[in-house]
UniProtKB/Swiss-Prot annotation:
Sites of Phosphothreonine modification: T931
Protein name (database record): Condensin complex subunit 3
Biological-process GO terms, alphabetical: cell division; mitotic chromosome condensation; positive regulation of chromosome condensation; positive regulation of chromosome segregation; positive regulation of chromosome separation
HEAT repeat copies, ranges: 94-131, 138-173, 174-212, 238-275, 276-313, 399-436, 439-478, 617-654, 687-724, 865-907
Other known facts: Overexpressed in some cancer lines and some tumor cells.
Tissues expressing the protein: Highly expressed in testis.
UniProt entry tagged with the keyword Repeat: yes
Assembly description: Component of the condensin complex, which contains the SMC2 and SMC4 heterodimer, and three non SMC subunits that probably regulate the complex: NCAPH/BRRN1, NCAPD2/CAPD2 and NCAPG.
Organism: Homo sapiens
Modified sites of kind Phosphoserine: S390, S674, S973, S975, S1002, S1015
SUPFAM superfamilies the UniProt entry points to: ARM repeat
């Protein structure tokens, strides 16, 4: 009898399992003992399922329910432990199969709770089974099929549990595995971020699924991106990814807007890859291909520097030759980049890093000689080496190392005069070298100009370098004049005759034994011989002279223009164009515009644009030249010219560039009586401005994405700065943003996506520009032919965007001051335009779009009377039932607002007769009553002022706006009796104790269900 008392009933086990501190392992053992004593296991199965049903109808994640589910899964799978007998496994496995059968029959129930609990239980059962557990193939197939169906459930939580349940049923080695295919679809297309996170945590990495996992690092939700980096760090080896994938992951993660994602990248993925590289930072850099992704590599190094002691970082650069320099023969791209990045990092640490910086950097004098020797060692590409890719690759590697060595100059201490002069001299010497690679010129000039502060000194030095490069001193031989040659020949003949005569006289003297005379003749003969030899040498040798020879080859012009461009970029605008600079313009820049080499023309256009920023007259003089380049040259040069034109328009405005200028005559005795002539000049000027803007705006339709983006950015800047006001161009920008053709233009989409709200909410004038663009934009979309990409754009979505951008409540606080002085808002004017458009074409297909936009407007009470007249006319002409219902609601709302406005006006008049005690309160109420409709809507509309689409998607959820309109209607219906107050003022925050008490009350106790009799 004692043994029977110790047997635990199923009901009691379920009751005890709810308790938070209950030892579930003991409960499992106790209930297992009861199970073994029963002869008829079917009774146990049915009773177990009966009590389990009570928890399966609860959707909320109650702690008691979760504990019971956990207990049930542990108990059922406890019979599959490895130490059980084989016959027991077969016998006791019946409970698991029975439970699976029941769950699989219930997975299609109408109740969300039941479907959720079925998937949860299957997930728990499969997860609690040991590694070597086996189930029937038939049961496996049924579970697989049922959970694949539940992956398409309408409830996200059900889909999540189905994803988790299928994790042990996937076969990553099978390319046709249905589970893997379903995961690959869900991870990209499921609308719920938690479902995508669940798939990320379950999907097994393989060659097929790796791109899907990597793609989630671009997910719109921060939590998904964060988990994606964690999964990649834990489950994917670095070698499994290509270099492009590694660089892309690091670039995105380190530049992510979310700090949590950045931390996940640095803490998990970056540290994991460093462990794969055995802690060797240089080896990690080698696996990132630093030559082609130096910016990403520098970001990686800075992230690693921030978590590594400075003494440890400096250790990698201490393998020097005693001069604090890394030997040239041991320099690699990774070491050079590490050295440069570390120097910049230590420089940024101030006094703390200065001590360590001195350990890895020498004095400027020593470093200057080191840099010069390395640059001189870079080989030159000859014609025979142009086809040798290994030679070219080695040359590019050396150039990359040279770039890093040049960048290290930023970290040198140039405060000492001697070191600074030496460094400047070496930089100038390097720039003059004929073998200097062009890729290093801009880096060298930038460092040179950084050391020199004075603009005039900069101009002087750069001009000298340009002169040395373009017109170097060369020694040449000069042919003598024919007359001089003739004179030398005559002199040579004369010397020869004298030699003959002297030799004959010498023989006679010897014969006569006149030795004194003979010695004199010998000396004379020697002098004549010397004269003959010298004259012979002069005749044979050409005259050598040092002359300046001007070079006009493409490489020389490119170097000179780079020098000029870097100088112009560094010069202050207030400096202007000096005489020296004008000389460079005439001799170098303007001839470069017509060069046959595209690289030279592009640099010349860049220089011309920078010169225009220095002087307005110069800009006006050469503006037409830039326009010509913009129309006829290559794409790259067109882009440079387009940017230069927009820069000059931003600096000086459109006025200086009108070809026809009104010249007011101030001469005595001259009167301007010809008004017609002045008007014609103004018309010509206006036409000129329009032609320029038309030329620029036409590039919005260019097939070249860079030209489209440049034109859109430039026009957006002009509009935002107030230099351009054009609803037509604004309409084209909106259409360009939505156009599916620009879907891949990330920079264009991002630029316009930021521009629209900032521009619209800056002032009422800008909102009026959007108001004017409203109807033309929608009409363009409505009239677009089926073959046009514009036909794919959702007109309703565009209308919602424009309505939100013109909301009076969205204006900046500074801009709202001007709004208060005007009776009608932008939405009021827009409402009138929409109503008139509906009356113009009451049967148009766009009537529903207009009606929906009309119902979303924030209308003031001042407009109610006039708008009601138009609405009555519209109701008589429009036949569409959907539109009629929406218009009726608008009419009712306006009638209420009109009535309230009249009552409030009377109340305001009565308020002026009250005592001074209540005067301030009455004035406050009067302000609230002035625009009751706008007052209620303003607070609720503030949440919907964001853009309705960021990437031109066709369908957009509009539930937020629907809820806002519902709340507005409710507020308006109650405003007859009380003053409408902002919704935010009615919210109260409950104290922590009240929240705790409410939570305790909400906890579900299953005892009342378990006490019911079995049916």
């Amino acid at each position: 009898m004692g043994a029977e008392r110790r047997l635990l009933s199923i009901k009691e086990a379920f009751r005890l399992a709810q308790q938070p501190h209950q030892n579930q392992a003991k409960l499992v053992v106790a209930l297992s003992r009861t199970y073994r004593t029963m002869d008829d296991k079917t009774v146990f199965h049915e009773e177990f399922i009966h009590y389990l049903k009570y928890v399966m109808v609860v959707y909320k994640r109650e702690p008691a329910v979760e504990r019971v589910i956990e207990f049930a899964a542990k108990f059922v799978t406890s019979f599959h432990q490895s130490d059980m007998e084989d016959d027991e496994e077969e016998e006791d496995g019946g409970l698991l199969n029975y439970l699976f059968t029941f769950l699989l029959k219930s997975h299609e129930a109408n109740s969300n709770a039941v479907r959720f609990r079925v998937c949860l239980l299957i997930n728990k059962l499969l997860g609690s089974m040991p590694e070597n557990a086996q189930i029937d193939d038939d049961v496996f197939d049924k579970i697989n099929k049922a959970m694949l169906i539940r992956l398409k459930d309408k409830i996200p939580n059900v889909r999540i549990q189905a994803v988790l349940a299928l994790s042990r049923l996937q076969d990553p080695k099978d390319d046709e595995c249905p589970v893997v295919n379903a995961y690959a679809t869900l991870i990209e297309n499921d609308s719920n971020p938690e479902v995508r996170r669940a798939v990320l945590s379950c999907i097994a990495p393989s060659a097929k699924t790796l791109p899907k996992i990597v793609g989630r690092t671009k997910d719109v939700k921060e939590a998904v991106r964060k988990l994606a980096y964690q999964v990649l760090a834990e489950k994917v080896h670095m070698r499994a990814m290509s270099i492009a994938q590694r660089v892309m992951l690091l670039q995105q993660g380190l530049n992510d807007r979310s700090d949590a994602v950045k931390q996940a990248m640095q803490k998990h993925l970056l540290q994991g890859w460093l462990r794969f590289s055995e802690g060797n930072i240089l080896e990690l850099l080698h696996r990132l291909d630093v030559e082609n992704s130096s910016e990403v590599a520098v970001s990686v190094l800075n992230a690693l520097f921030s978590i590594t002691p400075l003494s440890e970082l400096v250790g990698l650069c201490k393998n020097n030759d005693g001069r604090k320099l890394i030997p040239v023969e041991t320099l690699t791209p990774e070491i050079a980049l590490y050295w440069c990045a570390l120097c910049e990092y230590l420089k940024s640490k101030g006094d703390e890093g200065e001590e360590f910086l001195e350990q890895i950097l020498p004095e400027p004098v020593v470093y200057a000689d080191y840099l010069l020797s390395y640059i001189q060692s870079i080989p030159v590409v000859n014609e025979e080496h142009r086809g040798d890719f290994s030679y070219i690759g080695n040359l590019m590697t050396k150039e990359f190392i040279g770039q890093q060595l040049i960048l290290i100059i930023k970290s040198l201490d140039t405060s000492e005069e001697g070191g600074r002069k030496k460094l400047l001299a070496v930089l100038q010497e390097i720039l003059i070298l004929p073998t200097i690679p062009i890729s290093l010129v801009s880096f060298l000039v930038e460092r040179l100009l950084h050391i020199i502060i004075d603009d005039n000194k900069r101009t002087q030095i750069v001009t000298e370098i340009i002169s040395e490069i373009r017109a170097p001193i060369v020694t040449v031989g000069v042919n003598n004049d024919p007359a001089d040659v003739r004179k030398k020949e005559l002199k040579m003949a004369e010397i020869k005759v004298k030699l003959i005569e002297a030799k004959e006289a010498l023989e006679n003297c010897i014969t006569l034994q006149d030795f004194n005379r003979a010695s004199e003749l010998k000396e004379e003969i020697k002098a004549l011989e010397d004269a003959r030899i010298n004259l012979l040498k002069e005749t044979e040798q050409l005259e050598i002279k040092e002359v300046h020879i001007e070079k006009n080859d493409a490489e020389t012009l490119q170097k000179c223009l780079i020098l000029c461009y870097e100088l112009l970029k560094q010069m202050s605008i207030s400096t202007g164009l000096s005489a020296t600079m004008n000389g460079i313009i005439e001799s170098l820049i303007l001839p470069g515009i017509i060069s046959i080499h595209p690289v030279v023309r592009n640099l010349a256009v860049l220089c011309l644009g920078c010169c225009g920023l220095q002087n307005q007259d110069f800009a006006r003089k050469h503006f037409v030249l830039l326009l010509q380049v913009l129309q006829i040259d290559d794409v790259t040069i067109k882009i440079s010219a387009l940017k230069a034109i927009f820069d000059q328009l931003m600096t000086f405005g459109i006025e200086p560039f009108k070809t026809k200028k009104i010249k007011t005559l101030h001469c005595e005795g001259t009167e301007i009586n010809s008004d017609d002539e002045q008007e014609s000049k103004e018309v010509e000027e206006t036409a000129t401005a329009k032609n320029v803007l038309k030329l620029l705006s036409d590039f919005l339709d260019s097939e070249v994405s860079e030209l489209r983006t440049g034109a859109a950015e430039g026009l957006a800047k002009l509009m935002f700065s107030g230099l351009l006001v054009s609803s037509r161009i604004l309409s084209r920008l909106i259409l360009l943003w939505y156009n599916p053709v620009t879907e891949e233009d990330v920079q264009l989409r991002h630029c316009l996506g930021v521009f629209f709200p900032v521009f619209a909410y800056a002032s009422r004038t800008n909102q009026e520009c959007f108001e004017e663009a409203f109807l033309p934009t929608l009409q363009t979309l409505a009239n677009a032919p089926a073959s046009s990409p514009l036909a794919e754009i959702d007109i309703t979505n565009v209308a919602e965007l424009l309505v939100d951008l013109t909301r009076p409540s969205g204006l900046n606080p500074q801009a709202k001051t001007s709004q208060d002085y005007q009776a009608l808002t932008v939405h009021d004017n827009l409402a009138m335009k929409i109503c008139n458009e509906i009356l113009t074409s009451p049967c148009s297909p766009e009537i529903r779009v207009y009606t929906k936009a009309l119902s979303s407007l924030e209308l003031s009470s001042h407009l109610a009377k006039d708008l009601l007249v138009l609405l009555n006319e519209i109701l008589e002409q429009v036949k569409d039932r959907t539109c009629l219902r929406a218009l009726e609601k608008i009419k009712i709302q306006l009638e209420k607002g009109n009535k309230e406005f009249g009552d409030q006006a009377e109340a305001a008049q009565d308020a002026t007769l009250t005592t001074t005690t209540f005067q301030n309160e009455d004035e406050k109420n009067k302000e609230v009553y002035m625009t009751p409709l706008r007052g209620v809507k303003a607070t609720q509309a503030s949440k919907s002022t964001q853009l309705k689409t960021n990437r031109g998607q066709r369908k957009v959820t509009v539930s937020a706006r629907t809820n806002r309109r519902c709340q507005t209607a409710e507020a308006d219906s109650e405003s007859d009796h009380e003053v409408p107050e902002p919704e935010s003022e009615m919210k109260m925050r409950l104290p922590r104790r009240a929240k705790t008490a409410a939570l305790e009350k909400s906890k579900l106790n299953l005892a009342q269900f378990l006490n019911e009799d079995l049916s």
